Design a protein with these regions (language model features):
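Aromatic- and glycine-rich peptidoglycan recognition patches
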Residues: 110-151
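Secreted/periplasmic proteins that engage bacterial cell-wall peptidoglycan
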Residues: 3-114, 119-123
Length: 151
C-alpha cells in the first residue's frame, strides 16, 4: 500500500517519515505543509527550503534556481564545500546527475554513510512528491565540481 506509512529514514534529529514503499516521503506525517511564500510547491527549491527550516537550518527565501543555490549561499555567507554533512543542501549544477540543463537541482542530505554514499531527499523529480535517493561515493566523485554542499 503506497499510502501507508513506513519507518523513519535518515540520521537527522527530525528523520523523514517514509511511505511503505520506502521511496516516497510522507510530508503530511512530518507536519510539513504543501505551501511556501517564495518557492513553488513540490519544486526542488521548495523542499530544500522547508526541510532545512524543519531541521533548524533555514535558508534565504530568494536563493534562485537549484543550480544557483551554491553561489547565492556564498553571497549570503553560508559555508559551502565539496564535503557532505547530514543536513546540507546538495547543489547540482545544470545538467549534472540528470538535473535540468537550465536550472540545476537541489536536495537535502539526510545521511552520510560510512562508505561515503549519501541518502538525499528531494522534490521536483516526480509528480507532486518528495522522494529519496542514495548516491554512491563513486558517483559523487564522478560529479566532481558539478556539485557542492551548503552547510
Amino acid at each position: 500500500d503506497s499510502n501507508g506509512t513506513g519507518g523513519p529514514a535518515g540520521t537527522l534529529d527530525k528523520p523523514l517519515v517514509m511511505r511503505s514503499d520506502n521511496y516516497h516521503v510522507e510530508i503530511a506525517a512530518m507536519g510539513i505543509p504543501a505551501t511556501d511564500k517564495t518557492y513553488q510547491v513540490f519544486q526542488c527549491t521548495w523542499w530544500a527550503s522547508v526541510r532545512r527550516a524543519q531541521i533548524g537550518k533555514p535558508v534565504d527565501g530568494y536563493m534562485g534556481n537549484g543550480g544557483d543555490w551554491n553561489d547565492s549561499a556564498r553571497r549570503f555567507g553560508y559555508p559551502v564545500s565539496d564535503s557532505p554533512q547530514a543536513g546540507d543542501v546538495i547543489c547540482f549544477e545544470p545538467g549534472v546527475h540528470g538535473s535540468d540543463p537550465s536550472y540545476g537541482h537541489v536536495a537535502v542530505v539526510e545521511t552520510v554513510n560510512a562508505d561515503g554514499s549519501i541518502l538525499i531527499s528531494q522534490s521536483g523529480r516526480g509528480w507532486m512528491s518528495v522522494v529519496t535517493e542514495t548516491i554512491t561515493a563513486q558517483s559523487l566523485a564522478a560529479m566532481g565540481g558539478g556539485i557542492s554542499f551548503i552547510h
